[in-house]
UniProtKB/Swiss-Prot annotation:
Localisation per UniProt entry: Secreted
The protein, known as: GDSL esterase/lipase 22
SUPFAM superfamilies assigned: SGNH hydrolase
InterPro entries xrefs: GDSL (IPR001087), GLIP1-5/GLL25 (IPR044552), SGNH_hydro_sf (IPR036514), SGNH_plant_lipase-like (IPR035669)
EC numbers for this chain: 3.1.1.-
Subunit organization: Component of the PYK10 complex, at least composed of PYK10/BGLU23, BGLU21, BGLU22, JAL22, JAL23, PBP1/JAL30, PBP2/JAL31, JAL32, JAL33, JAL34, JAL35, GLL22 and GLL23.
Organism: Arabidopsis thaliana (Mouse-ear cress)
Database matches in CDD domains: SGNH_plant_lipase_like
Gene designation per UniProt: GLL22
Key word rRNA processing present: no
UniProt main location, coarse: secreted
Region (Disordered) residue spans: 372-391
An example molecular function term from Gene Ontology annotations: hydrolase activity, acting on ester bonds
Keyword Transmembrane helix included in the entry's annotation: no
Residues forming the catalytic site: S43 (nucleophile), D322, H325
Length: 391
């Protein structure tokens, strides 16, 4: 009798294990995990749209771009970019397709990001965020239903080109003019996010701006030297970033219970700056110059046919592959932070948590200002800077 009971218990245990593996755990009220990833913004998220939009050949379609994977596919990296890794972590089996290319598979999301994109103005051979949103709306009816869109993640990185252009065109702008411009940019960002929300999107991942003054191309153009960043651009980026969290909090709190606005904010600024100042902790040995390019910081002309650019021997030791874009190694790190880091990096929840958060539930946690830490972005090659946690 005891033997029969043991056999029965064993059979029940096997059935339970098989049931658990066959039916993945889901959050109450959520029948399935996230179904797609949509990205918007500039060259950091461009999956190949620039190649379709421009009438000229783009360097990103040719070697040494894609060097790490022997696949120059129009992405501004030596290999994959952050959304590629994030999609893998989200169990999306397909690469995020460039939406502007014909005959691509957009069944699990699409990239609308284009190199040179801005929030304001009319960029040449590029698109504003508003134009990208309109393109999404044009494609929506034929490709994605409302339930699909509501459960998908919408990821945005935009604004860098606005501030780079403003600084170049207004070198003597005072604090008042800078503040007014930041307000214009962030107000436009809010309007464009609202337009996406009105189209049915509900889950947003907003990436703050990088420390723009520490980009190798900026250091090179403004002759900062090897150990200094251009603080005017960093200040503009910080002013911009400070407005993002409160803006999204307001949008979430004001959204109707029938269509909750859900979001998270990735502190990209400090994620980059930490690796710039504590480079050896992350096994980056060059953070103030590019792997590919020419000039004082090897930051210009990577891949251009009329430029004899230098190319480093080992790109994984560089934080930046070209003058504006991070190496694949760094991009993968950022994707890991987005997907699984704590609230020191991405808040009020990480992307893994956002994907399973019930789409019909209002947010109960919100963005809060980080603990102040005053550290200037100088001496970038040093590993002794203080004031930042390792993330």
């Amino acid at each position: 009798m005891m033997a029969n009971n043991c056999n029965l218990v064993s059979v029940l245990c096997v059935i339970l294990v098989l049931t658990l593996f066959h039916n993945p755990i889901t959050v109450a009220g959520q029948n399935s995990p996230v179904v797609a990833l949509f990205t918007f913004g500039d060259s950091n998220f461009d999956a190949g749209n620039k190649q379709t939009l421009t009438k000229t050949l783009v360097a990103q379609g040719f070697w040494p771009y894609g060097k790490s994977r022997d696949d120059p596919n129009g992405k501004f990296s030596d290999g994959l970019i952050t959304p590629d890794f994030l999609a893998k972590f989200m169990k999306i089996p397909l690469a995020i397709a460039p939406a502007l290319q014909p005959n691509v598979n957009v069944s699990r999301g699409a990239s609308f990001a284009v190199e040179g994109a801005t929030l304001l103005g009319a960029p040449v051979e590029s698109m504003t965020l508003n134009q990208q949103v309109k393109k999404f709306n044009q494609m929506k009816a034929a490709n994605w239903n409302d339930d699909f869109v509501a459960k998908s993640v919408f990821m945005i990185y935009i604004g860098a080109n606005d501030y780079l252009n403003f600084t170049k065109n207004n070198p003597t702008a005072d604090a008042s003019a800078q503040q007014a411009f930041v307000t214009s940019v962030t107000n436009k960002l809010k309007n464009d996010i609202s337009a996406l929300y009105s189209s049915g999107a509900s889950k947003f991942v907003i990436q703050t701006l990088a420390p723009l003054g520490c980009l190798p191309i900026v250091r090179q153009e403004y002759n900062t030297g090897m150990d200094q960043c251009y603080e005017k651009l960093n200040d503009l980026a910080k002013q911009h970033n400070e407005k993002i969290g409160p803006m999204l909090n307001e949008m979430a709190r004001n959204s109707p219970a029938s269509a909750p606005f859900q979001f998270t904010v990735f502190d990209f600024y400090n994620a980059v700056l930490t690796r710039t100042q504590r480079n050896q902790n992350f096994r980056f040995f060059v953070t103030n110059a590019s792997c590919c390019g020419v000039g004082s910081h090897d930051a210009y002309g990577c891949g251009l046919p009329n430029v004899h650019s230098k190319l480093c021997e080992y790109q994984r030791s560089f934080l930046f592959f070209d003058g504006r874009h991070n190496s694949e190694k760094a991009q993968e790190m950022f994707a890991h932070l987005l997907f699984g880091a704590d609230t020191n990096v991405v808040q009020p929840m990480n992307v893994r948590e956002l994907t399973v958060y019930p789409v019909d539930e209002p947010m109960r946690e919100f963005w809060v200002p980080p603990t102040p830490a005053t550290v200037h972005a100088s001496d970038s090659s040093s590993s002794t800077s203080r004031g930042y946690e390792y993330y």
